[in-house]
Amino acid sequence: MVKLAKQIVVRGRVQGVGFRWATKMIADNLDISGTIENRSDGSVFIQAAGEPLNLAKFVAKVKAGPNPYANVSTYEEQPLEDVPNFRGFQVTG
């Protein structure tokens, strides 16, 4: 099973609106593992790993905003060369 991993930073109305927990639900449904955390600059930082098709679906949902209260104004991603060995998808901060 081939896995890809990405590091993602989203900005906009992404804190205090349930963004992390909605993203976790999406990740759990798509069998994506990784972490998500709020950053002090108001952004949200995500590391996500999974099968390519599921990871693409996850990214599309994150870009669109995982719930109706969130609004993603900027989205940045970088591939991770080494796929971390995450256990599930965790809200870490």
Swiss-Prot record:
Active site annotation, chain numbering: R20, N38
UniProt keyword annotations, A-Z: Hydrolase
Q: Does the keyword Hydrolase apply?
A: yes
E.C. numbers: 3.6.1.7
InterPro entries documented for this protein: Acylphosphatase (IPR020456), Acylphosphatase-like_dom (IPR001792), Acylphosphatase-like_dom_sf (IPR036046), Acylphosphatase_CS (IPR017968)
The GO terms describing molecular function are: acylphosphatase activity
Q: Where is the Acylphosphatase-like domain?
A: 5-93
Enzyme class, first EC level, given as a word: hydrolase
What catalytic reaction does the record list?
an acyl phosphate + H2O = a carboxylate + phosphate + H(+)
Q: Which domain of life is it from?
A: Bacteria
UniProt family annotation = Belongs to the acylphosphatase family.
What is the name of this protein? Answer: Acylphosphatase
> Which organism does this sequence originate in?
Lacticaseibacillus paracasei (strain ATCC 334 / BCRC 17002 / CCUG 31169 / CIP 107868 / KCTC 3260 / NRRL B-441)
Q: Which gene encodes it?
A: acyP
